[in-house]
Amino acid sequence: RDLTMLSTPRPHDLVWLNSAAALEAIEEHWVAQHWRTSLPVVVRRDVDADARVPVGVRGMKREQRAAGWVRMENIVRTITPETFADRLLLLRSPLVSQPPVQAAISLTLHPWPWRWGITGGTGYALATEIPVLHAASDLDLLIRAPQPLDREALLAWQSRVAQLPCRADTQVETPAGAFALNEWLRDGRALLKTSRGVRLTATPWNREEA
Protein backbone atom coordinates (compact mmCIF):
# COMPACT_ATOMS: atom_id res chain seq x y z
CA ARG A 1 0.00 0.00 0.00
CA ASP A 2 2.97 2.34 -0.12
CA LEU A 3 2.32 4.92 -2.77
CA THR A 4 4.48 7.34 -4.64
CA MET A 5 2.51 10.50 -4.22
CA LEU A 6 0.88 11.75 -7.40
CA SER A 7 -1.29 14.37 -5.70
CA THR A 8 -0.77 16.75 -2.81
CA PRO A 9 -0.22 14.87 0.46
CA ARG A 10 -2.84 15.33 3.16
CA PRO A 11 -2.37 16.11 6.86
CA HIS A 12 -1.14 13.09 8.84
CA ASP A 13 0.35 11.37 5.77
CA LEU A 14 3.89 10.14 6.40
CA VAL A 15 6.34 11.07 3.64
CA TRP A 16 9.95 10.09 2.96
CA LEU A 17 12.37 12.52 1.32
CA ASN A 18 15.19 12.03 -1.16
CA SER A 19 17.78 14.01 0.81
CA ALA A 20 18.34 15.79 4.10
CA ALA A 21 18.59 19.05 2.16
CA ALA A 22 14.95 18.59 1.12
CA LEU A 23 13.87 19.78 4.58
CA GLU A 24 13.50 23.55 4.38
CA ALA A 25 13.11 26.22 7.09
CA ILE A 26 14.06 23.93 9.97
CA GLU A 27 15.66 25.83 12.84
CA GLU A 28 15.90 23.20 15.59
CA HIS A 29 19.47 21.94 15.99
CA TRP A 30 18.50 18.43 17.06
CA VAL A 31 17.01 17.67 13.63
CA ALA A 32 20.43 17.54 11.95
CA GLN A 33 21.66 15.17 14.66
CA HIS A 34 18.71 12.79 14.89
CA TRP A 35 16.73 12.89 11.64
CA ARG A 36 17.79 10.93 8.56
CA THR A 37 16.11 10.20 5.24
CA SER A 38 15.21 6.65 6.29
CA LEU A 39 12.70 8.25 8.68
CA PRO A 40 9.44 9.82 7.52
CA VAL A 41 8.18 13.29 8.29
CA VAL A 42 4.49 13.95 8.89
CA VAL A 43 2.37 16.29 6.79
CA ARG A 44 0.84 19.07 8.85
CA ARG A 45 -1.81 21.74 8.22
CA ASP A 46 -0.54 25.02 6.74
CA VAL A 47 -0.36 26.92 3.46
CA ASP A 48 2.63 28.18 1.50
CA ALA A 49 2.83 30.72 -1.32
CA ASP A 50 5.39 28.51 -3.08
CA ALA A 51 3.11 25.43 -2.95
CA ARG A 52 5.50 23.60 -0.67
CA VAL A 53 4.19 20.81 1.56
CA PRO A 54 4.11 21.62 5.31
CA VAL A 55 5.73 18.88 7.38
CA GLY A 56 6.77 18.13 10.93
CA VAL A 57 9.80 16.19 12.13
CA ARG A 58 9.52 13.95 15.19
CA GLY A 59 12.46 13.48 17.52
CA MET A 60 13.05 10.69 19.99
CA LYS A 61 11.79 12.86 22.85
CA ARG A 62 8.15 13.88 23.13
CA GLU A 63 9.01 17.59 23.16
CA GLN A 64 11.14 17.29 20.01
CA ARG A 65 8.92 18.52 17.21
CA ALA A 66 10.09 20.73 14.36
CA ALA A 67 8.01 22.36 11.60
CA GLY A 68 9.37 22.78 8.11
CA TRP A 69 8.55 22.59 4.41
CA VAL A 70 9.36 20.26 1.52
CA ARG A 71 8.85 20.43 -2.21
CA MET A 72 6.73 17.85 -3.96
CA GLU A 73 9.58 16.69 -6.19
CA ASN A 74 11.60 15.67 -3.13
CA ILE A 75 8.96 13.26 -1.81
CA VAL A 76 9.80 9.69 -2.77
CA ARG A 77 7.30 7.66 -0.74
CA THR A 78 4.02 8.23 1.09
CA ILE A 79 2.01 6.21 3.59
CA THR A 80 -1.51 7.26 4.56
CA PRO A 81 -3.07 6.69 8.00
CA GLU A 82 -5.47 4.17 6.44
CA THR A 83 -2.54 1.90 5.62
CA PHE A 84 -2.31 0.97 9.30
CA ALA A 85 -6.00 0.04 9.69
CA ASP A 86 -5.13 -3.41 8.39
CA ARG A 87 -5.50 -6.37 10.73
CA LEU A 88 -2.77 -8.48 9.12
CA LEU A 89 -0.31 -5.59 9.11
CA LEU A 90 -1.00 -4.95 12.79
CA LEU A 91 -0.76 -8.63 13.74
CA ARG A 92 2.59 -8.92 11.96
CA SER A 93 4.04 -5.79 13.54
CA PRO A 94 6.91 -6.21 16.02
CA LEU A 95 4.86 -3.83 18.19
CA VAL A 96 1.79 -6.10 18.28
CA SER A 97 1.95 -6.55 22.07
CA GLN A 98 1.69 -2.81 22.77
CA PRO A 99 -1.73 -1.59 24.03
CA PRO A 100 -2.30 0.95 21.20
CA VAL A 101 -1.68 -1.74 18.58
CA GLN A 102 -3.94 -4.20 20.41
CA ALA A 103 -6.59 -1.47 20.52
CA ALA A 104 -6.28 -0.85 16.79
CA ILE A 105 -6.61 -4.57 16.08
CA SER A 106 -9.89 -4.64 17.99
CA LEU A 107 -11.23 -1.78 15.86
CA THR A 108 -10.46 -3.72 12.67
CA LEU A 109 -12.86 -6.46 13.79
CA HIS A 110 -15.86 -4.24 13.03
CA PRO A 111 -16.91 -3.25 9.47
CA TRP A 112 -17.16 0.52 9.94
CA PRO A 113 -19.02 2.49 7.23
CA TRP A 114 -16.06 4.82 6.61
CA ARG A 115 -12.35 4.78 5.97
CA TRP A 116 -10.26 5.26 9.08
CA GLY A 117 -6.62 5.23 10.01
CA ILE A 118 -3.97 5.60 12.68
CA THR A 119 -1.93 8.76 13.17
CA GLY A 120 0.36 10.21 15.84
CA GLY A 121 2.99 8.22 17.67
CA THR A 122 1.39 4.85 16.98
CA GLY A 123 1.27 5.45 13.23
CA TYR A 124 4.88 6.64 13.28
CA ALA A 125 5.96 3.60 15.29
CA LEU A 126 4.16 1.23 12.92
CA ALA A 127 5.82 2.88 9.91
CA THR A 128 9.34 2.89 11.34
CA GLU A 129 9.21 -0.04 13.80
CA ILE A 130 11.03 2.23 16.25
CA PRO A 131 9.98 1.08 19.75
CA VAL A 132 8.63 4.40 20.99
CA LEU A 133 5.35 2.97 22.34
CA HIS A 134 4.81 2.11 26.00
CA ALA A 135 1.98 1.10 28.32
CA ALA A 136 0.70 4.67 28.64
CA SER A 137 0.87 5.53 24.91
CA ASP A 138 -2.25 6.98 23.29
CA LEU A 139 -3.87 5.82 20.07
CA ASP A 140 -4.64 8.68 17.68
CA LEU A 141 -7.33 7.84 15.14
CA LEU A 142 -8.60 9.52 11.98
CA ILE A 143 -11.96 9.07 10.26
CA ARG A 144 -12.30 10.20 6.63
CA ALA A 145 -15.60 12.02 6.18
CA PRO A 146 -15.97 13.64 2.76
CA GLN A 147 -19.74 13.69 3.49
CA PRO A 148 -21.60 14.09 6.82
CA LEU A 149 -21.65 10.82 8.76
CA ASP A 150 -24.47 9.10 10.61
CA ARG A 151 -24.49 10.23 14.24
CA GLU A 152 -25.58 6.83 15.57
CA ALA A 153 -22.68 5.13 13.78
CA LEU A 154 -20.28 7.70 15.22
CA LEU A 155 -21.70 7.09 18.71
CA ALA A 156 -21.13 3.36 18.22
CA TRP A 157 -17.52 4.05 17.22
CA GLN A 158 -17.03 6.31 20.23
CA SER A 159 -18.50 3.66 22.53
CA ARG A 160 -16.09 1.06 21.15
CA VAL A 161 -13.16 3.47 21.46
CA ALA A 162 -14.04 4.15 25.12
CA GLN A 163 -13.57 0.43 25.86
CA LEU A 164 -10.11 0.14 24.29
CA PRO A 165 -7.11 -0.85 26.45
CA CYS A 166 -5.54 2.60 26.06
CA ARG A 167 -6.57 6.21 25.75
CA ALA A 168 -7.73 6.95 22.21
CA ASP A 169 -8.76 10.16 20.47
CA THR A 170 -10.51 10.45 17.11
CA GLN A 171 -10.20 13.29 14.62
CA VAL A 172 -12.77 13.50 11.84
CA GLU A 173 -11.37 14.82 8.56
CA THR A 174 -13.83 16.73 6.35
CA PRO A 175 -13.24 18.74 3.17
CA ALA A 176 -13.13 21.85 5.38
CA GLY A 177 -10.70 20.60 8.03
CA ALA A 178 -10.61 18.28 11.03
CA PHE A 179 -12.37 18.22 14.40
CA ALA A 180 -12.38 16.16 17.59
CA LEU A 181 -15.19 13.61 17.47
CA ASN A 182 -15.81 13.53 21.23
CA GLU A 183 -16.16 17.32 21.33
CA TRP A 184 -18.67 17.37 18.48
CA LEU A 185 -20.76 14.50 19.88
CA ARG A 186 -20.82 16.13 23.32
CA ASP A 187 -21.42 19.77 22.40
CA GLY A 188 -22.92 19.69 18.92
CA ARG A 189 -20.06 21.88 17.74
CA ALA A 190 -16.30 21.65 17.69
CA LEU A 191 -13.10 23.50 16.90
CA LEU A 192 -12.36 22.88 13.23
CA LYS A 193 -8.66 22.86 12.39
CA THR A 194 -8.05 24.20 8.89
CA SER A 195 -4.92 25.13 6.95
CA ARG A 196 -5.64 28.78 7.78
CA GLY A 197 -6.41 28.46 11.47
CA VAL A 198 -9.06 27.21 13.87
CA ARG A 199 -12.74 28.11 14.09
CA LEU A 200 -15.66 26.96 16.23
CA THR A 201 -18.47 25.49 14.15
CA ALA A 202 -21.56 23.29 14.32
CA THR A 203 -21.26 22.51 10.60
CA PRO A 204 -17.74 21.13 10.13
CA TRP A 205 -18.49 19.94 6.58
CA ASN A 206 -19.07 23.48 5.35
CA ARG A 207 -16.16 25.32 3.81
CA GLU A 208 -15.77 28.85 5.17
CA GLU A 209 -12.94 31.29 5.37
CA ALA A 210 -11.35 30.85 8.78
Per-range role (PLM):
Residues R1-G121, L154, Q158-C166, T170:
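Helical scaffold of the NTase/Pol beta-like nucleotidyltransferase catalytic core
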Residues E27, P40, L181-A210:
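Conserved NTP-donor binding/palm subdomain of two-metal-ion nucleotidyltransferases/polymerases, i.e.
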Residues I105-L139, I143-L149:
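Active-site nucleotide-donor binding segment shared across nucleotidyl transfer reactions
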Residues L133, W157-V161, D187:
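Short, solvent-exposed amphipathic alpha-helical segments in soluble enzyme
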Residues D150-E152, F179:
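Short, charged/polar "capping" segments at the starts of alpha-helices
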Residues A162-T194:
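Conserved catalytic core of two-metal-ion nucleotidyltransferases
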